[in-house]
Amino acid sequence: DPAGITTYSVLGADYGYQLLWVLVASMLALIVLHDLAARIGVVTRQGMIGLIRQKYGARSGTLSAGALVLANVGTMTAEFAGIAAAGQLFGLSKYVSVPVAAIAVSFLVLRNSFSTVEKVFFVISAGFIAYIIAGFMAGPDWGAAAKGVLIPTIPFTQEAIFIATATIGTTLAPWGLAFIQSYAVDKRLTKDDLLF
């Protein structure tokens, strides 16, 4: 998630621990909203766009679907920009890394079952453990971090408000809610699958 990594990095680089509470609040909201979206999918057996169409009509459903497509295009653009940047760190041209990645992802998604794709991305996501390890290796000031999490403060500057808003926006992406709700439907989850 290059957009998220960039946003979180700017948040930390520019404000240290001061706005850490924004990240924690965003993650808590992410957990609650994704849980809610999954529950809506379980109970209604419909994805988000289908429910919008049913409740508000075809025009609203079409507009919502269009907005999600635009959001997905933006997200994919950011992902491939991240692939290009990562490739350049290793001396690989973006004109090589991006097409190779696009072909590999397209092949994976279009030529394999959903279950296989899910397993591959689950294994790849294990790489995120490196962020946790790097965080501990950086030797943070745990007292300042706790203060940044527990005592919300924000400098009332345009830059601080912008990065706080960007953090919330990159964490709570609407396409993620639509995906989770549809995922619950596609996996045929039932009320018995819910923990509470």
Each model region followed by its residue ranges:
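Hydrophobic alpha-helical segments and their helix-loop junctions in multi-pass secondary transporters
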Residues: 126-153, 157, 161-182
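Juxtamembrane transmembrane-helix boundary signature
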Residues: 22-55, 64-70, 74
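Helix-loop-helix connectors at the membrane interface of multi-pass transporters/channels
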Residues: 50-51, 55, 79-98, 185
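Select transmembrane alpha-helical segments in multipass membrane proteins
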Residues: 57-70, 156-167, 196
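Transmembrane alpha-helical segments of multi-pass small-molecule transport proteins
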Residues: 63-66, 89-110, 127, 131
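Hydrophobic, small-residue-rich membrane helices and short re-entrant helix-turn-helix hairpins
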Residues: 7-10, 178-196
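Membrane-water interface regions at transmembrane-helix termini and the short interhelical loops
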Residues: 79-89, 102-124
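Transmembrane helix-boundary motif of multi-pass solute transporters/channels
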Residues: 1-26, 81-84
